Amino acid sequence: MAAQVVYVAAKLGLADLVTQEPKTARELAQATKTHGPSLGRFLRALVGLGIFTEDEKGRFHHTPLSETLRSEPVRAWAVMLGAPFIWRPWGELYEAVVTGRPAFERIFGSIYSTIWPRTQMIARSSTPQ
């Protein structure tokens, strides 16, 4: 779960949006074109993980952890590691152990015909939307 939370935060570019001045969930929702109440709950999950802090006015501030998600190169890694081609095979681990067939190939086909195009897609999508 935490990996997906970090992935979404990186994909939305939240750490870059909470710059020198703290932002409210509403301000961040407008900047990211996301659903305000959902983003507010999501930001509180990030607070729970120590990635941001929230003050009494509902503004979100950086922590040392959130600073690592600002721009490149760490944000790109967080986006890549949260991508479906990384996490989906773990859901098939049991089948892989039982059958001996690699989970990645079961889901996506050949690693060589799948991984390189997806790597390019992720590189392009690491820029906040």
Where do the model's predicted regions map?
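Conserved Class I S-adenosyl-L-methionine-dependent methyltransferase catalytic core
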Residues: M1-Q129
